[in-house]
């Protein structure tokens, strides 16, 4: 089953052409890793999937719903698409448990007790149930990012988007977040992940996409992508990020 379909997608920021003729199909359970230099359009691409960014040309269909200016359709898609950002975006004045139950209660109209049970299940899933009654400021960066993942999972998404989820973390915290994402991948979650963590890409990706100057330059399975990239721009990029 196709979960995300992008056809000839283009986007501009004023005169800047940030996405150029993007064509991409993602099937259920597929893990896609998107890499490329800074400013290449990686984050914009995945932010278009849940309409955090609006494309100006082409079609984007998510779980059978085409993204247009219809606000109800946008809301329907966002209920099914979880997103984890570079910065954790947790509410500092709410406890970890309250951060995780807010959307299920207000958006899905879930009863508080049920929402708390779901939240504790996913906090346990990301291995920090003991932090439930603390506030975000009391947690490490890695713990906060795992809370952000749990919070997204509480909405029972069909697709997870990750926008450089480890880039603002100290090196010793990166592994704990990547381990959580690897675990999600092994359970069959459909994932689109923007990251420079090439070891993660090798381990979990079904396909790796290299994007540069708003264009998909190369897309391939990890073994072929890393061992025999076809394009000079891909080879140049990999020579810089693989140490």
Give the residues covered by each predicted segment.
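ABC family nucleotide-binding domain
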Residues: 2-222
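Absolute protein N-terminus
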Residues: 1-2, 243
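C-terminal boundary and immediately downstream tail of ABC-type ATPase nucleotide-binding domains
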Residues: 213, 219, 223-243
